[in-house]
Amino acid sequence: GGGELVALIVGEGKGGGSSPLRAYVSRTLPDYAPILVCNRAPREPKPEGGFARGSGGVITALLTMAEATGADWVACARNDAERELAAKDGAPVTVPLLQSTGRLHYATPTREQYEMYYGVIANPVLWFIQHYLWDLGNEPVIDQRIHEAWSEGYVEVNRQMAKRVVEVARAATKRPLVLVHDYQLYLVPHMVRQEIPAAVIQHFVHVPWPTPQYWKVLPKPMRDAILEGLLGCDIVGFQSSLDVRNFLLTCEENGGLQVDERERAVVAGGRVVYARHYPISIDVLRTQGLAASRGVKRQEADLAKWRPKHLIARIDRTDPAKNIVRGFIAYEKLLRYHPELRGVVQFWAFLQPSRQDVGVYSRYLRQIRQMAGRINSELGTEEWQPIRLEIAESERKAIAALKNFDVLLVNPVYDGLNLVVKEGALVNGTDGVIVLSENAGAHEELREHVLSVNPFDVEATAAAMYAGLTMGSEERHRMNEAARDVVRVNDIARWISNQVQDLRDLVAPGRAAVRPELHQPAPDTPDRRRN
């Protein structure tokens, strides 16, 4: 049990300049005990024994953050294996995390509570609101099941997570610095604040923050509780400046609160809450190391055996927000408008299955398969298939695709940030062109170095793919290099250090609850330098 987890965790997280970063964080915030709070643990027990690294860009980023801050990690036991691990020896599991002094602590809701919290409210209700995915003429239908899932699932699991955070915080010798992550845990900050008023609390929202009107899909008690939860923070972090503006508007319109747009701050309950944006990024050194690894080179050798003259690629989870079906429709139009491309181009869709226990997601994967199948049967020949559809998970294969694309299609309906586009910009070695949705958070940073598209406009998307395939080599090279430079500079270390600076500058110890200088120019925060 625990020993294996220790062995796995120690010795990871060396990338991304994490040791200098660790020194910087402890210099900047010396008097705090950091606690990272996330629905998922960084390591997950496998049914056959041993542990797997938590998958996904967010977990990778949070591992770097935990390593940089030496944070304890509070997670939710999400399945029987984790519940069993948490209950071993009659005590919650606390194991060394990374090379830091931190430990891992579980909250342990019942299977039913977890399902209501995660499988009903978080996904799809909140996810679909925050990505504008509901077909509002027909759904959602907010019935007794959803009301019960809210109170007995979402509120209850947030309460259990907050209780665990408070226990960990009270055991610490320094002032707690609570770093909460994502849409599953909106209520935690207020709950922790009630128990530990002196805590410094930040919540980082990884998904888009929609307009106040769209939040009105949720019944008022639910959306009020979400705002109240977040306003327990000192700082609420978002992926883009648009998310910050939407959040401030939501506080003003739906919450009736006093907002200072220039300072990007809300006054609530006699406290000032700041809203700031910190676009998440990737660990540049780790990603480059992976791209140069033998495993990736083996995948590239396999790719070379079947690679067409022109390779269009996409790497995504099979989530309706990723807009995969419209991407296929646009590609079909490309082939019909430009028949000379048939036989010399192939669209490689390398997709990771997502949330197949949620009906909307399993239906979406079916649609993806059907659309690819139809296009292949109508336009394909014995020698050539227009779409190569692979449903699997392999980080090495994904990186091999990103190193070799001519066009990378990243066309989400809405996306908090999108790390695939940053990985592609960093590792691509073929002067590939990125076609990027204007509704991805990453568009704010990369807009000048990509071909921007409206994700709903399949004609424009087809035209952008064609422009990418036919662009002159000098322009391709220039765009490719410029995008890479943006990612190199705005790496994961900068994401973390910008947050740390704001925690120091905006929430300095001993400052009055309401800053009298709120309406004076703010200190020189990282955000100011960026905007």
What are these regions, as identified by a protein language model?
Residues 3, 7-531:
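Catalytic cores of carbohydrate-active enzymes across secretory and cytosolic contexts
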